Every structure is written in C-alpha cells, then in structure tokens.
Amino acid sequence: PGGVRPMYGPIPPGSEWHSPVSTPYDPDEANRILDRAGYPRNENGIRFTVEIDYEPSAQFSLSILKYLQSQFIRTIGVYFRIRTAEDPGSWADRVTSGAFDVTMDELYGWHDPAIGIERIYATNTAAILWSNMSHYSNPEVDALFRSASAEKDPEGRKALYAALQERLSREHVALWLCTIPYATIRNRNVLHVADQPFGVL
C-alpha cells in the first residue's frame, strides 16, 4: 500500500527519536550459519518448519506473511506454516500463554518511545498482549529505557535511544518489516485538526 516505509529497527522512521541502524541483508551468510548450526536442506530444499501466527483481523499482516513465506523458503530453506486463529481472542490466548513459535503483529508506537516502544521490550511487560509478547529480557536494555525516559535533555535522550536501537537490532530481538500509514479524514470546515495520536483519538 502507498505510504508504507521499510523498518530496520525498533523505532520507526519519521520519529524524532529514530536513528539508522546497520542490519545487513546477506542470505548467503544466513545459509552458511544454518548449515553450521546443523540444519541442512532436505530433498525438497527445506531445512525446518516454523509455525507463525498473526492477529486474524489484520489482513495486511496476512498479505505480508504470504510474501515472507515464499521468500524464506526460496532464500534460506525455512518454511513458514501460517496458522490462522478462529478469532482475535484465540490468538491473544496463544500469545499470552506462549503457545506459539513466532507471531506477527501490528504495533502502534504512539508519539514517544517511553509510551509505545519500551513496552515491547521491557522485562516487566512480558506476556502482556501488545507488549513484550516474545518474553525478551535484558537488564541492560531495561536500564537504558529507564534512563532515556527520565532524560530531560533532548540530545542526551536521543543518544540513549540510538544506543537502544543499535543494541536491539544487534540482538535480532524482532524482524521489523514496515510502517503502516494511518489516514485522518476530515471535513474541510473542521479547522486545526491535530495530527498527533492523542489529537485524533
């Protein structure tokens, strides 16, 4: 869809706290790593299967998953078996209980990383829906988030978030894919409409 932008790290491009991170795309090296790890391709070219869930009302996610399914099997021999939940509640139960291999979700970053991004990686939000669903835990990352949210100097805060983005991307905490644009439709007679999330809700 128009307006979608690729993401290479935890804070989306366009945010004042975004910093570029180095996430090289190297399928050849990925294949070498999988070979060394003891996952050879079988006669069908498949190394192993990963079951991947998604929130069933998010049709945009399903479209991306079908594309990734073809790309992963072709480039590195990993097959994604897409599992569709009967309803959003069933998906939520799987995610919060940890009964899944991988899940894909559309998360909203809000206007500040302390509100919208920290919850995705903080140890104390593990297993909470639309928060740290992967159960990721790193005390150093927790400390960086606390320092960044308390930092009053904008430049100092940006430096802390830059360090966080580099750390999280280096640890491959998630596979960040893209942004999803939101549109605000208004009558031309309505003036001074805020374009920030708390203004349009």
Which residue stretches match the model-derived regions?
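Short helix-initiation/N-cap motifs at beta->coil->alpha
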Residues: 82-93
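Surface-exposed patches in mature extracellular/periplasmic domains of secreted proteins
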Residues: 8, 42-45, 80-84, 156, ...
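Structural motif corresponding to the C-terminal cap of alpha-helices
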Residues: 37-41, 76, 152
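Short alpha-helix C-terminal cap/hinge motif
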Residues: 68-82
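Detector for C-terminal structural segments
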Residues: 1-22, 28-29, 60-70, 92-201
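Short, well-ordered beta-strand elements
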Residues: 47-57, 80-83
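Immediate post-signal peptide segment of exported/extracytoplasmic ligand-binding proteins
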Residues: 27-51
